[in-house]
């Protein structure tokens, strides 16, 4: 599979906040992006193309269940090629769930769809 991973400005703002709070966040995200390039269909599908993926933050020490959530939007050019947009990231302790309607609004505001 050959999927390109891109970030949105909204994601970058939220990731910067988490990177300040958790020292290992940047390294955790790097590992996450590498795994996402290999398997973009991981996580739970919230709506067609929109997925919620659990991310463990090592410095938080709570594993995936208490870590962060990364929202992605996948556009497939074929079964083995496409783009994965990192739309949002949030700490599970700050928000318990993400509203699909708000996520769709963020995606459209970023000019992805």
Task: List each model region and its residues.
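Arg/Lys-rich, positively charged N-terminal/basic patches that mediate binding to nucleic acids
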Residues: 1-29
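Alpha-helix C-capping/helix-to-loop hinge sites
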Residues: 14-18, 39, 56, 90-93
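Compact soluble domain cores
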Residues: 24-42
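A short, surface-exposed loop/turn module that caps and links secondary-structure elements
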Residues: 37-61
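Arg/Lys-rich, often Gly-containing low-complexity segments of ribosomal proteins
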Residues: 57-68, 72
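Enriched for short, Lys/Arg-rich terminal
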Residues: 68, 73-113
